[in-house]
A protein has these predicted regions:
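Helix-loop-helix module between adjacent transmembrane segments
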Residues: 54-55, 96-97, 126-153, 162-202, ...
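N-terminal alpha-helical transmembrane segments of multi-pass membrane transport
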Residues: 1-102, 112-119, 130, 472-516
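Transmembrane helix-loop junctions in multi-pass membrane proteins
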Residues: 57-62, 104-108, 193-205, 215-217, ...
Length: 516
């Protein structure tokens, strides 16, 4: 039996196994109600309301404290001897590496092809609202993190849900928190294996195949797919052995470089077509509010935009707190402020750049995808760049590979923490997960794009339901932590240090932020 037939059999078997699961879970999670002829998934309302509630509760903190967040990430308020494994900046880049990935490249293309250019506007709105949600969950992640004897840290919803709810509501809260923690861990583990691993490998392989001659090229065979998966799995396995310090060391160098190169390339395409920019913005705004536009007009664009933005920035899912919990700090809210920069970088900056590039270039593959003749994805983005720079798909291939690699690394860490919460923290347990994770990386190069999108979307939003319930219940805790940190900031700015004491009443602008 040839290698091609073996890999084809594996592809068909794995795809046949997961496709029914993806369809069933998608039907449950994306249950929709009909409003004026447009189907509105209830999960979209869940995410929108969460972002609105937290934005109002904390006085639009994503705008009012944006400057403070930048000062914190630069280390202005660092304290010697603070517990943790990595700096604010390293924690941010590790978390960003899990969000700035193929969702920004392939996901945006899918959003524009399904929801039209108007989906871009709603993606930006989702990103801005998600900043407040991210602040809440990361603050909780740091407050209730677990410090181990070897200096390592464990955090995330599997820790702040049981501890926080027990602290606030006693025995009843402890029971509810435990149930939510187990469910959240299962979802993080599931999404880590599929959305954070398989999807990334699948799309990066698709791009590599496209620039090496397509299905008839060097990497077009099943053997090429298997080889690619094995190489990625080996690289991921090596880095995962070093834990969050190793991952942060890689991402703190890789993420800034990737972002700068990618945004610069987008700006080049936009600059070459500078005369088309006003029309592109006009089209985005018009179609965002077009009552009879693409895929259901306003509602269609909003639904697609929010779905893709959530897939990209992960606000409210409980994943980012796992990385941020490792930050060296005595003030949970300080890392929460750092975390609110994530959706801004991921969605407001990078996703917008990708969307503008696609809308301005308007490659033929976009029209084909909107007509339902192809799935689209990373190929649309690649074709958009190629309209200006014929050789750029090769550069994009490198960017896609690096984006995917960093995302797979971070989600490997997230998945490991979920795994050890469920099955115990031991060398044997961790080794089993790492082997399993690398095997899934190999499988990622053998699955179809549509199955991956459906399954990853469903798992992603299931996690959002579980986590946001906990965020609502624990929001008062976050308010107190913010008040305490702002007190510390004022003391530091005055040249004094009041320690970490209890929160005191706020005045002026800070009071407006922390008492709403």
């Amino acid at each position: 039996m040839s290698l091609d037939s073996i890999t084809r059999t594996i592809d068909e078997s794995v795809g046949g196994f997961f496709e029914p699961i993806a369809t069933w879970l998608g039907d449950v999670i994306f249950y929709a109600v009909d409003i004026n002829g447009a189907e509105v998934p209830l999960i979209v309302a869940w995410l929108v309301i969460a972002g609105l509630v937290f934005s109002g509760w904390f006085g639009l903190i994503q705008f009012r404290k944006f400057g403070l967040a930048l000062r914190v990430v630069r280390g202005k308020y660092d304290e010697k001897g603070a517990e943790g494994e990595v700096s604010h900046f390293q924690a941010l880049t590790a978390a960003v590496s899990g969000t700035v990935g193929l969702g920004n490249i392939a996901g945006v293309a899918v959003a524009v092809s399904i929801g039209g250019p108007g989906a871009t506007f709603w993606m930006i709105i989702c990103g801005l609202l998600g900043m407040a949600t991210k602040f809440v969950e990361v603050t909780l992640g740091v407050k209730y993190r677990e410090m181990h004897g070897d200096g390592t840290v464990s955090g995330g919803p599997m820790h702040y849900l049981p501890k926080g709810l027990a602290e606030r509501f006693g025995a009843g809260g402890a029971k509810l928190g435990k149930v939510l923690a187990v469910l959240a861990s299962a979802m993080i583990l599931f999404f880590g294996l599929f959305g954070g691993n398989l999807f990334q490998v699948n799309q990066s392989y698709a791009q590599l195949t496209a620039v090496t001659g397509g299905e008839d090229g060097l990497m077009g065979s099943s053997g090429g797919a298997l080889l690619f998966g094995i190489v990625i799995a080996a690289l991921v396995g090596v880095v995962l052995l070093g834990g969050i310090r190793s991952i942060a060391s890689v991402t703190s160098r890789l993420v800034p470089a990737m972002a700068v190169i990618y945004v610069a390339a987008c700006l080049l395409v936009i600059t070459v077509n500078i005369t088309a920019v006003p029309a592109a913005f006009e089209r985005i705004i018009d179609e965002a509010f077009d009552p009879v536009g693409v895929a259901g007009g306003i509602l269609g664009a909003l639904i697609v935009g929010f779905k893709r933005a959530a897939f990209s920035n992960e606000a409210g899912l409980g994943s980012a707190p796992i990385a941020h919990s490792a930050a060296k700090t005595r003030h949970p809210a300080s890392e929460g402020l750092v975390a609110l920069l994530e959706p801004f970088i991921d969605t407001v900056v990078v996703c917008t750049m990708t969307a503008l590039t696609i809308v301005i270039a308007n490659p033929p593959s976009l029209s084909e995808a909107r007509a339902g003749e192809s799935i689209g994805g990373v190929t649309i983005t690649s074709d958009a760049f190629e309209t200006v720079l014929p050789w750029f798909p090769y550069v994009l291939t490198v960017a896609v590979l690096l984006f995917a690699f960093s995302t797979v690394l971070t989600w490997g860490y997230y998945g490991l923490k979920a795994w050890t919460y469920l099955f115990g923290r031991s060398r044997a347990s961790e080794l089993i997960f790492k082997v399993l994770y690398t095997v899934f990386a190999v499988a990622g190069s053998l699955l179809t794009l549509q199955t991956l999108i459906d399954l990853a979307d469903a798992v992603l939003f299931t996690l959002a339901v579980i986590n946001i319930i906990g965020l609502y219940l624990l929001a008062p805790v976050v308010k107190r932590e913010l008040s305490s940190f702002l007190q510390f900031v004022r003391a530091r700015d005055r040249g004094t240090d009041t320690g970490t004491g209890d929160a005191e009443p706020e005045t002026g602008e800070d009071a407006m932020t922390t008492t709403r």
